Amino acid sequence: NILFICSEADPLVKIGGLGDVGGALPAALHSLSKEGGNYSSLDIRLAIPYYPKIKIQDIPTRFITSIKIKTAESPVEARIFETSLSGVTTYLVSGEPIDRSEMVYGLDFKTDAEKFIFFSLACLQLPHALHWTVDILHANDWHTAVAVHQLKDLPNKP
């Protein structure tokens, strides 16, 4: 069971090469799982922020669950939606730090940090909320670094 977490995934959101990888790598591994053999047991899933620019696209989504993310001030709700991207189950993480940002990346580093810390922490809690065990957490670039750092605090680490 592999969970990819990424700030971009083409065709939903692509600013640069990270969007290419976020869209193509999970899809390529998913297609291997459909071929059978040694890869047939792969369960590939992807999580990306549910940016406002994705919300205005006409893609089918369904609400899955809410997760409370602890912050220094008070818990913030992360709402998790599901869609499919090239056959890959894709989770869209929504919540105040992500919702208030019109752009994927802004010039305000504090706002970007809050957005991606929130996203990373939500992704760590996502498998538990889904009753799904993750064997490998594939974190892409600095936007998901907090998730890797916080793995040490999880009782059942991927």
Model-derived regions, located:
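A short acidic (Asp/Glu
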Residues: 14, 56-59, 146-151
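Short amphipathic alpha-helix
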Residues: 18-30
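Conserved dinucleotide-binding and phosphotransfer motif residues
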Residues: 32-33, 40
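Conserved nucleotide-sugar donor-interacting segment of glycosyltransferase catalytic cores
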Residues: 116-158
